[in-house]
A protein has these predicted regions:
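Active-site acidic carboxylates
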Residues: 1-93, 146, 161, 165-168
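Histidine-anchored nucleotide/phosphate-binding helix
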Residues: 34-35, 130-139
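Short, conserved loop/helix-junction motifs that constitute active-site signature segments
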Residues: 40, 112, 138-140
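Internal catalytic-core helix/loop-beta-alpha segment
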Residues: 73-126
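A short glycine-rich beta-strand->turn/loop micro-motif centered on a GG-aromatic cluster
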Residues: 119-123, 144-157
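Structured adenosyl-cofactor binding patch, chiefly the S-adenosyl-L-methionine
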Residues: 136, 152-164
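A glycine-rich helix N-cap at a beta->alpha junction
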Residues: 171-174
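Conserved small/polar residues in nucleotide/adenosyl-binding loops
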Residues: 177-178
Length: 178
């Protein structure tokens, strides 16, 4: 059985764009190393893309978070830095209009054989990472789901810690590097 790495929304707008925050750029190298590790082991890699249209501000999310970001076709929608160079045509890609990906959930449920483990990295820990980790755990309840704390972050350190704590309560393992 293969392992699965899900790179969640490591896009320009979340790193140094309209919703970027200090420290998000520091995840580039650890995430790149993780992708290379999985690729060298011939494991499976998937990417999620937060994907909005020009009418974003008219959506429920846009009314609650009135900051245009990750507009399809705009530079902010693209993967950030070195991560953009590491995606391959054979990787799975899930564009999502909201925090969690229903398509990812369905794909995980249909995966046969199931994955040995599912690991998530990327942004933002307390929004899209937690949403997709919960979906992964729901889709594959017998598969270990892992979030690498060194490869995720939030604009608010307190919310990052709370997200990791909530995930632990849902039996999602948080890797913490000391």
């Amino acid at each position: 059985m293969k392992r699965l790495l899900i790179v969640v929304d490591y896009q320009n707008d979340f790193v140094d764009g309209s919703l970027g925050f200090p420290g998000a750029e520091l995840l580039e190298e650890p995430i790149a190393a993780k992708i290379e590790e999985y690729r060298s082991a011939a494991d499976v890699i998937a990417f999620t893309f937060d994907t909005h249209r020009c009418d974003y501000l008219e959506t429920q999310e846009g009314r609650n978070l009135p900051v245009e970001h990750c507009i399809e076709g705009a530079p902010g929608h693209a993967l950030y830095g070195r991560i953009a160079e590491l995606i391959r045509p054979t990787d799975e890609v899930f564009e999502k209009p909201s925090f969690g990906s229903a398509d990812l959930f369905e794909w995980l449920r249909a995966a046969q054989p199931p994955f040995k483990s599912i690991e998530l990295v990327g942004l933002v820990s307390n929004i899209c990472v937690i949403s997709n980790a919960v979906l992964a755990k729901a889709a594959c309840p017998e598969v270990p789901v892992i979030v690498d704390a060194a490869c995720t972050a939030s604009f608010d350190d307190s919310l990052n810690e709370k997200a990791l704590d909530v995930l632990e309560g849902l039996q999602v393992l948080s890797l913490i590097h000391i």
